[in-house]
Regions:
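N-terminal signal-anchor transmembrane alpha helix of single-pass membrane proteins
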Residues: 1-41
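N-terminal short leaders/motifs
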Residues: 7-18, 48-57, 129-130
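Exposed regions on extracellular, virion, or secretory-pathway luminal proteins
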Residues: 21, 42-43, 158-161
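Intrinsically disordered, low-complexity regions
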Residues: 22, 36-39, 46, 66, ...
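N-terminal topogenic membrane-targeting module
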Residues: 24-95
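Structured extramembrane domains adjacent to transmembrane segments
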Residues: 70-191
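Short amphipathic C-terminal alpha-helix that caps PH/PH-like domains
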Residues: 188-203
Length: 204
């Protein structure tokens, strides 16, 4: 049986459209689910959630009073699901679904430090955080001056999470945290928030 070109073209258009629609629906469900998880852990940590925004590939939650953070925002960045080939290519290239926390503290430190998980894309930008590099457990500690003396328990707690980067610095935003989205999201975010105070004190 012969199939003319117009039929093939129509079938391709229908398939691509269906893929885009399905990808957008799946993406929106994912962001809705992650947003609910985030709001739950943020409120459990005593934060006041002020606003939320969502789309099929991102979500933004902002508020105040999160541990040491006076003001904060949490951005969820998902790899777009609308184009399955693009999604697979992004995964093969090492890109991940991420949760990114930024915030300000009342008393910023006089110098900065960043913890970057070894063996992840986070270490590619290590030099932007400082010139001094030291290894501490599963992380590289990058600072401008001599490395701060961090409590070993802080490093140990962070090591068991999906935290990729945690930075505390004098400039706004004072705190950065990048977390790989997964089953450890809640414990990772909680550990990062609790570590901020210890890191800031070590930098004083």
């Amino acid at each position: 049986m012969q199939v003319d070109e117009s039929t093939v073209l129509l079938a391709l258009i229908v398939a691509i459209t269906a893929s885009i629609v399905a990808g957008n629906v799946l993406g929106r469900r994912k962001t809705d689910s992650v947003t609910l998880r985030l709001i739950g852990v943020l409120r459990r940590l005593g934060a006041e959630v002020k606003a939320t925004r969502r789309s099929s590939s991102m979500a933004l939650v902002s508020g105040r009073g999160l541990g040491e953070l006076e003001e904060f925002s949490v951005l969820v960045g998902l790899l777009p699901r609308a184009n399955i080939l693009g999604y697979l290519a992004a995964r093969l290239a090492g890109r991940r679904d991420l949760v990114m926390l930024r915030g300000s503290v009342k008393k910023p430190p006089k110098r900065g430090v960043a913890l970057l998980r070894k063996g992840t894309p986070a270490v590619r930008g290590a030099r932007r955080w400082g010139q001094k590099v030291a290894e501490v457990g599963e992380f590289l500690m990058v600072s401008e001056g001599s490395p701060p003396d961090l409590d070993r328990e802080v490093i140990k707690t962070l090591s068991g999470t999906s935290l990729l980067l945690l930075a505390v610095r004098p400039e706004l935003p004072h705190v950065y945290a990048y977390i790989e989205l997964g089953p450890k999201l809640e414990t990772s975010l909680e550990a990062a928030v609790r570590a901020v105070e210890a890191i800031r004190n070590a930098l004083s």
